Amino acid sequence: MRKQSTTILTLPDFSKTPSIDQVGVEERVARFQTRSIKKESKVQGLKLALNMIDLTTLEGKDTEGKVKQLCYKAAHLHDVMQGIPTVAAVCVYPTFVKLAKRCLEGTNIKVASVATAFPSGQSTRKVKISDTHFAVDNGADEVDMVISRGEFLEGNYSYVFDEIAAVKQACGTARLKVILETGELSTLDNVRRASEIAIYAGADFIKTSTGKISPAATQPVTLVMLETIRDYYYKTGKMVGMKPAGGISTAKIALQYLVMLRETLGDKWLSNEWYRFGASSLANDILMQLQKEQDGVYQSGDYFSKD
């Protein structure tokens, strides 16, 4: 059931958003990529990354059968290997939320739903709010919305802020992840500004991408977003989550993202309450790497289910 929020949101002066030193960002990312992870820490990191995944299917050809299969996989990873955690959530279109909730009943796996005319965001606010209400009323624990990139790029920051705040209110008790679609924002300065708008408007998480355009998540963009979260935390004491999504398909890259997370935000963010990976194939590679660490042998990719 939806509950009305009484939070009063105020709009800071986003013209004072600091400029980003792109060279400095790239240098910091390069340092994270050189970190060596020893075996015991690697296994711990792989399990943590697995527990942070939003296992996702967001295709026009999605069917009830595919969603059921995805939910089964999410709930039965331990059938493949003992002692591993579940994923954090399954992410689907609003029309499949009720089905996913039914399939995952009795587990601690959340159901996330995209909304607000995903992935383009090209619709009226009324339609976006209705889309959000539909997802929440059908049981979505989390909502992944998209910002209006056209309005943002035209400098209509108040419009973007107000829309996010309205969707946040429509979410009630469901957590809100705000997708910036960083591949369409062109500059790191824009990524920083969009991150600030989303955070101040009430985002529980900020998220890089829909996964529908290229580039999707990149490490420089993710670092800028993490640093925005850090600066907001220093100023307010409030934690905001982060979700890189799209293009993260290997365990090696996921571990690099976790190193970046820990060294930028600290251990408090090292849980799926505050960090997620949006992915469809990452889980399989993590399972393969865990099997290798356990048995010393790589399984064929076909050993693990694809969906």
What kind of region is each of these model predictions?
Residues 1-50:
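Charged, compositionally biased N-terminal leader segments and the immediate start
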Residues 40-48, 61-85, 95-243, 249-280, ...:
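Alpha/beta enzyme core
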Residues 285:
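N-terminal beta-loop-helix "entrance" segment that forms/cooperates
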Residues 58:
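A short, histidine- and acid-enriched strand-loop-helix "catalytic/donor-clamping" loop
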